[in-house]
Amino acid sequence: MTKLFAHRGFASKNIPQNSIASLKRAYEFGFRAIEFDVWFLNKKLILKHDRPAEKEINNLANFRDYFFFGNEFNYWIDFKNLDEKNSENLLEAVKKILDEAAINLDQIYFAPFITDYKIAEKIFIKIRKIFGEKINLIAVCEELKTSADVEILREFLTKNKIKFLSIFHKIIDQDFIKKFSDIEIFAWTVNDLKRLKELENLGVRNFATDKIIPDLKID
């Protein structure tokens, strides 16, 4: 079944991305899956795509806010600055909030935005240590320039037992799908219904979107 993830909530001209308003607007438009960006700054988990200025931090939505609808949603969480130095404090803070909100872990997809596979491997180990081996981990891929890049990614996913991949949708074609047939793809950011249908025909089932609402989707 296809999942449409509201990309940073369902923003509009007057409703900013990664805001409580964009979360609620996503719900109103029928989304039951959401993608959002998280920063760990000043010991706080706050939401914004680009790194916020110090003066912004207290005015932004926080991590807890985005679980307002509890287990009605699936959550694709893009951790923007999760690294080896802050991982323990960040992940413990995340666990505390998820426990308090009683969120089912099988509805959470952890997607640290780390394209250095050596660092990503270390972070995935830390996440599994805290949340268990069954936690949904998403690797991230922005580009694949050469066949060697493809093989490196393939080896990384296999070695680390990663079943999910977040990837720019224009990279995906039939050849790509053949090479990663055992991997569940999370495509971003798909705003054209024709392109979504093309990807569906290739077997892709998870999409981040700014424009396509669930009512327009016919499974």
What are these regions (language model features)?
Residues 1-219:
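Phosphate-group recognition and catalysis centered on beta-loop-alpha active-site segments
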